[in-house]
């Protein structure tokens, strides 16, 4: 299959139109929109309820650790999809590589369990 530079022209035109639309919309709204400022408009709004106290409550590091572990294992599971699509073409060599990959994931998961990273004590 031979690729020509003109084959990419519709893609670049679409990207240019999308970026141009966004830029023109932002510039147009700043010129056309009202610019009245008042104390009532500048107040924080949260579902019509008056805010009380400070909104900056410290979170436990456990939440961030669980979120990072979720993203880590979620991204690794995404690698299973191309393997499943090309399973027949990869043959036994692809199967062995995937077993090694999954065993590394399992070792990492057991390490997390051993370090008690998911316990909420």
Curated annotation (Swiss-Prot):
Catalytic reaction list: a quinone + NADH + 5 H(+)(in) = a quinol + NAD(+) + 4 H(+)(out)
Keyword Transcription in record: no
InterPro entries with a match to the protein in the record: NAD(P)H_OxRDtase_bac/plastid, NADH_UbQ/plastoQ_OxRdtase_su3, NDAH_ubi_oxred_su3_sf
Gene3D superfamilies assigned to the protein according to its UniProt record, in alphabetical order: NADH:ubiquinone/plastoquinone oxidoreductase, chain 3
Protein name, UniProt field: NADH-quinone oxidoreductase subunit A
Residues annotated as transmembrane: 8-28, 65-85, 93-113
Taxonomic lineage from the root: Bacteria, Pseudomonadati, Bacteroidota, Flavobacteriia, Flavobacteriales
One Gene Ontology term of the molecular function aspect: NADH:ubiquinone reductase (non-electrogenic) activity
Sequence similarity: Belongs to the complex I subunit 3 family.
Taxonomic superkingdom: Bacteria
Alphabetized UniProt keyword annotations: Cell inner membrane, Cell membrane, Membrane, NAD, Quinone, Translocase, Transmembrane, Transmembrane helix, Transport
Aminoacyl-tRNA synthetase as UniProt keyword: no
Its biological purpose: NDH-1 shuttles electrons from NADH, via FMN and iron-sulfur (Fe-S) centers, to quinones in the respiratory chain. The immediate electron acceptor for the enzyme in this species is believed to be a menaquinone. Couples the redox reaction to proton translocation (for every two electrons transferred, four hydrogen ions are translocated across the cytoplasmic membrane), and thus conserves the redox energy in a proton gradient.
């Amino acid at each position: 299959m031979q690729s020509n530079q003109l084959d990419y022209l519709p893609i670049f035109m679409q990207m240019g139109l999308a970026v141009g639309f966004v830029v023109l919309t932002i510039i147009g709204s700043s010129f056309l929109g009202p610019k009245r400022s008042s104390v009532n408009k500048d107040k924080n709004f949260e579902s019509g309820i008056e805010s009380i106290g400070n909104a900056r409550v410290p979170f436990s590091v456990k939440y961030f650790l669980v979120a990072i572990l979720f993203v880590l294992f979620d991204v690794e599971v995404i690698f299973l999809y191309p393997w499943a699509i090309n399973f027949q073409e990869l043959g036994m060599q692809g199967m062995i590589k995937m077993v090694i990959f999954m065993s590394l994931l399992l070792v990492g998961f057991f390490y997390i369990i051993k370090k008690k990273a998911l316990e909420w004590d």
